[in-house]
Amino acid sequence: MELKGSKTEQNLWTAFAGESQARNKYTYFASKAKKEGYEQIAAIFEETANNEKEHAKMWFKELNGGEIPSTVENLEAAADGENYEWTDMYDEFAKVAEEEGFKALAAKFRGVAAIEKEHEERYRKLLENVKGDLVFSKDGDKVWICRNCGHVCIGKSAPKVCPVCAHPQAYFEVKADNYM
C-alpha cells in the first residue's frame, strides 16, 4: 500500500501537528503554573508535554519511512520551510491583518518574517558547511570550544576527541564571543 496521498497520510500530518501544538501549549502552561506557585501542576504539564513530543516524533517518523531523515535532508527541509514562511505565509498574513485593521499584528507578522529569513540563511549556510565538510574544519586557524566541558583550542580543525573530557569532535564548535 502507498501511504503518499492517502487519507491515512493526512491523518498522520494532522496527528503530528496536534501533538506538536499540544506540546508547546503544555510547556507554556507549565511555565505559568510555576510562576503562580504550582510546582506539581507545572511538573505534570512538563511530563505531558514530553509525552506529546514523543507522540509527535512517532507520527513524524511514520511520515518519513519509519525514521528521522538525515541532517542534510533536515537542513534542506528546514530552509525550504523557513523560506515559505517569510516569502509567502507571513507576507500574506500581514496583508490580511492590515486589510482587517490589525496594524500591530501586521507589523508582528512582518517582524517574524524577517526572523524566518535569517533562519533560512542560517540553515542554508549550515547545509553548505555539511556538504563542504566544513563543520569541523575551516580555512585558517579558528578558536574551537568543546560544548561539553568548555575546553578551548586553536587550529584549522577541531580535535577528533576532546583532550579534557574525551567527548567526540561532534561536541566542538567555533567559539563565538558575543558578549564583548
Language-model-detected regions and their locations in the chain:
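Non-heme di-metal
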Residues: 1-180
